[in-house]
Amino acid sequence: MSYVDEVYARVVRENPSQPEFHQAVREVLDSLRAVIERNEEKYRREALLERLTMPERQILFRVPWVDDQGQVQVNNAFRVQFSSAIGPYKGGLRLHPSVNLGIIKFLGFEQTFKNSLTGLPIGGGKGGSDFDPKGKSDREVMAFCQSFMTELYKYIGADVDVPAGDIGTGAREIGYLYGQYKRLTNRYEGVLTGKGLSYGGSLARTEATGYGLLYLTEAMLAANGHEIAGKTVAVSGAGNVAIYAVQKAEQLGAKVVTVSDSTGWIYDPAGIDVALLRDVKEVRRARLTEYAAARGSAVYHEGRGVFTVKCDVALPCATQNELRLEDAKALVENGCIAVAEGANMPTTLEATDYLREHGVLFAPGKAANAGGVATSALEMSQNSMRLSWSFDEVDAKLKQIMANIFHNIDAAAKEYGMPGNYVAGANIAGFLKVADAMEAQGVV
């Protein structure tokens, strides 16, 4: 059994009932085989893959809080500090009923490579809780966030671990979390990113993941003889990433014809109206049925189906494993030339393989959606220097970072004999930086 297979078998054995974590580790290790085989004896002696796939620290705790009826509620919470080899732990806090330790570990593992790809000094981590902010009053959300931070604050800090927003954790939640951290520590520091502009946040942070996705997609298309202008784009999701991916795609001359939420999806052949979408989702916090009701060219469909429409580029921006094998087949049949992941691991391994086998350009999430964490790191820089950059300054830095990410993953894929395999290129480029740092720092 090869070293890679031994490590994967150990991960499965020691982390039962964590399929998302298994999937993430399998995908990374498989694409690293060419790298590992060049130095297998050294990596085995140093147990480098074992240390890379095992979090440095896993923090599990309960979060008791009181609802509006006076009933005490208790939620499970997690913070997985995966790797600090290249900087303080960095990764979001997810608030969703589906959250469990396996999902947080998968996200933290992916985050390590994504953060490495940015070229910025940030390690990998992730956290969250099975608390659902949907349907809760502001007071209930505040009560949860304050209780959550009362335990979490012991393990984080501007130079230790810097959490951020994620699914379910927006500006409101970050504000409550930051307020409680400041209250407990009496320190005003850049311990969270995604903060409001009035207390240390960065311009362009809200737009960053969606904009960055399009900047990398644009670079990938250009390197393969295509341009984004004039392309028809299918986007899934209707949250932060999807909204600003739609906005930037249209600014670059593409036409986006779909968006989706948890109940259904919209097909709008005239092109998605970004202003209306933002009003429905960000202001009214309503379902997409209201978008369809307000726009004559739009048709609402219940259930899944975003990837059945004819498109040149597909951007899955909703959640993990949303783009399945049958979706990949539909995309290929409809002439799709490129897929770039806006969400974390939204494409199943079977779908990824099918797309690549059929010549579809494929940009994995750890590269394509790194714009969010890159801009979080830029927020950390501004906090450290007590500065605030303009929107255009941050956007220009983001565009350069995304162009560099594509250049690095493209070069890594070519160096190891896999030109055009951006999944392998992203994993290899991310791995090499982390591995070099781990070796330099000794057995820690």
Regions found by a protein language model. Give the residues of each.
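Glycine/serine-rich phosphate-binding loop and adjoining beta1-alpha1 elements at the start
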Residues: 96, 115-229
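General beta-strand structural signal in soluble alpha/beta enzymes
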Residues: 160-164, 188-192, 235, 258-261, ...
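Adenosine-phosphate binding glycine-rich loop
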Residues: 2-24, 220, 332-444
